[in-house]
């Protein structure tokens, strides 16, 4: 029997340290809910879960961008609906004025209402806003950059001769819909004030190429302001004071109604696409969160079992240390 080195106590102390460390880790997992709390717990798992978490955060912001863009389009479409109602009333008046049974004085009265309705179209276009962004007018599209990033979309006037005839001004709504830099879609929105609805031939076509003008930002596009080329000369007023003018104005009004209807159809199609994107994004987020939880989260039942085991082993090791420390005392009995 030796007394300088109590091997039994040393062995029990070493095992007690191991059990205490394991118990501490298990308690940390139980308190945090995570299986991986630091890279040493699972280096590969930490790396994979970090990338998955970044993708989840990016997709979550993209989903919020999409929701805001849908709200934006719904607001725009609602204002276009009001403009269309006014145009339909103007068409009624133009048809009425074209009737030969009315005198010039009667047509003058009709013209007064026409002018009030054109003012109403301009009022709707000027006051149609979303987060201080003018949706249906020719006003400057420069906005606060931070606001644009939060919305994930930014309006801007564009100079696209290939996409316009007449003098229609427009801007592009660009929405960041994915977790990566290049995942953005855009739609053109044409101004719906009198100057644009009744200018030149009034025809419009879809944009032929993506807008590249401006600086790409995270979640937003900040295009530089520009103007559409004018090919139709001075804007023509809506005049129904004579039969000839009424017929001419009727053609313009019908063309304006067609423009508004086409714009609403385009926005409706774009909204449907955004809703589909949002659904697929939410589904992707759900799957990624499941993968993240599988890698990162702790299985509570397993950790409770491990904590109980390590607690018992720690207490047992402490008891063994106490007993091992009693062995050298037996040497004293030999000296008596």
UniProtKB/Swiss-Prot annotation:
The keyword Zinc does not apply. Coiled coil: none annotated. Changing residue 279 to N: In strain: B31 and KA. SUPFAM superfamilies: Phase 1 flagellin. Residues 208-236 are annotated as: Disordered. It comes from the Bacteria. It is found in: Periplasmic flagellum; Periplasm. Component of the core of the flagella. This is Flagellar filament 41 kDa core protein. It comes from Borreliella burgdorferi (strain ATCC 35210 / DSM 4680 / CIP 102532 / B31) (Borrelia burgdorferi). The lineage of its organism: Bacteria, Pseudomonadati, Spirochaetota, Spirochaetia, Spirochaetales. The gene is fla.
